[in-house]
Regions:
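Nucleotide and nucleotide-moiety/phosphate-recognizing core
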Residues: 1-173, 178-194, 201-202, 209-212
Length: 212
């Protein structure tokens, strides 16, 4: 399998941060997006940013910006589809996605996702972390892992199927990945979950503390 392209998902609405682009928030003197770029770029063959609206606000990042091709903020799957369409134009086989508000994801993300896809006709893998004891209890014992649907390996070959699913109203990532035999790559969640994302001002303060 050739080295995948990377797509950073920044197309959502940051309602819990008062709107605007979460990825442009500063964390330790560097934007969240810049931190995500620094982590993902060494792992992939090339990078693009999925974002909607005026692309000029991201001009300083030096990345191609690809907007959702499905209107109405259809969620992460629309961003994945936009990334797959871009990757198809580059002649790539697959992409790895990462969220723009998750600055601590693993530096071996891509290697472990691609390893988990070995033998798959169409590589499709989501990142997971173990649930804590409290989380298992709250879920009634259903499932022992948390799946992180914005962190995955996605095959260009299934983009038309994904487009049809989104146009048909599908929004939940794991429903689509399960339909296509998606696998999981398990990452440790100690000393903290590396897929911790910044959704609120309190989360941003916690991220600042983790940098120290």
């Amino acid at each position: 399998m050739q080295k995948p392209l990377g797509v950073i998902l920044a197309g959502g609405l940051a309602t819990r941060m008062g709107g605007g682009d979460k990825g442009l928030l500063s964390l330790g003197g560097q934007s969240l997006l810049s931190r995500v770029i620094d982590r993902l770029a060494p792992q992939v063959a090339g990078l693009a940013l999925n974002a909607n609206g005026d692309a000029a606000r991201f001009a300083g990042l030096g990345l191609p910006v690809v907007a959702d091709t499905i209107e109405g903020f259809a969620g992460p799957l629309a961003g994945v589809l936009a990334g797959l369409d871009w990757a198809a134009e580059q002649g790539a086989e697959a992409i790895v996605t990462a969220a723009a508000d998750t600055p601590f994801f693993p530096t071996d993300l891509v290697a472990r996702l691609t390893a988990a896809a070995e033998g798959q006709a169409h590589p499709l893998v989501l990142a997971t972390t173990p649930k804590s004891g409290d989380e298992v209890l709250k879920s009634g014992g259903k499932g022992r892992v948390n799946r992180h649907p914005t962190f995955g390996l996605w095959p260009v070959a299934l983009r038309d199927d994904l487009r049809a699913a989104i146009e048909g109203g599908l929004r939940k990532v794991v429903l689509w990945t399960d339909q296509h035999g998606g696998r999981e790559a398990l990452f440790e969640a100690e000393p903290f979950d590396p897929f911790f994302n910044v959704n609120t001002p309190e989360d941003l303060a916690r991220a600042e503390a983790l940098l120290r």
